[in-house]
């Protein structure tokens, strides 16, 4: 039914083994191309997601988005080959830091994500984390906000997939999510941050720790809501 597939013979359509929580993912093969079809399970601002993925594609860090069908609740984009990793070596960390820096340079006009409003937990630990953050300037950039290993593809390059949570927020939130998701030890964390930040930029470890606390709490809240 889509012009995208006119004059293309569909050879295969299959449900992918690796599935996300927010979408059903299908691989569609034509005679000369492979596509990812994402059937939405949850409500999100999909127009914003499509726009952000296009901006990220322009920076060579995402699959090319091809079609958004809000009526049928699906998005089609180019299929990316790559490997998911749960453990990162120095080369991976360096590449990931550079791609993240690239993402954070993208200009987007949007209403920023309010982390405090997003969290239902008002635990002492969470409150203390937000008190710490009040001491620091908010460095608002376009963040992916869901950098778990299943959303990062490694080949010669690094690319991100599943952009539904992407929005403007402090860049330390993405940095914290990488540190948490890959369980980086002190040495790996220092190496990662050293390749993300410019030499003239100060690294605020206290701010990073506060964002780790908030990220973990948001993950817990999200999984409990499923």
State each model region's role.
Residues 173-201, 214-226:
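Active-site activation/catalytic loop segments of kinase-like enzymes and analogous catalytic loops
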Residues 7-16:
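Conserved N-terminal boundary motif of the eukaryotic protein kinase catalytic domain
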Residues 202-212:
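All-alpha amphipathic helical-bundle segments outside canonical DNA-binding/catalytic cores
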Residues 15-111:
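ATP-binding pocket architecture of kinase catalytic cores
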Residues 44, 84, 152, 168-170:
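Conserved protein kinase catalytic core
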Residues 142, 159-162:
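Pre-DFG segment of protein kinase catalytic domains
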Residues 1-7, 108-145, 149-150, 155, ...:
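An alpha-helical support segment within catalytic cores of ATP-dependent transferases
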């Amino acid at each position: 039914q889509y012009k995208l597939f006119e004059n293309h013979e569909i050879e295969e359509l299959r449900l992918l083994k690796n599935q996300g929580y927010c979408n059903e993912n299908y691989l569609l093969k034509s005679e000369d191309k492979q596509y990812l079809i994402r059937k939405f399970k949850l409500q999100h601002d999909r127009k914003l997601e499509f726009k952000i993925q296009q901006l990220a594609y322009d920076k060579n860090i995402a699959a090319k988005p091809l079609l958004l069908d809000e009526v049928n609740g699906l998005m089609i984009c180019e299929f990316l080959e790559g490997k998911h990793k749960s453990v990162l070596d120095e080369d991976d960390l360096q590449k990931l830091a550079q791609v993240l820096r690239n993402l954070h340079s993208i200009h987007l006009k949007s209403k920023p994500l309010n982390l405090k409003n997003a969290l239902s937990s008002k635990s002492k630990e969470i409150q203390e984390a937000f008190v710490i953050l009040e001491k620091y300037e908010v460095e608002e950039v376009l963040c992916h906000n869901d950098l778990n290993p299943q959303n990062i593809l490694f080949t010669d390059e690094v690319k991100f997939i599943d952009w539904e949570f992407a929005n403007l927020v402090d860049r330390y939130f993405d940095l914290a999510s990488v540190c948490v998701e890959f369980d980086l030890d002190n040495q790996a964390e220092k190496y990662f941050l050293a390749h993300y930040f410019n030499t003239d930029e100060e690294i605020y470890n206290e701010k990073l720790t506060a964002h780790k606390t908030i990220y973990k709490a948001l993950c817990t809240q999200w999984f409990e809501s499923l």
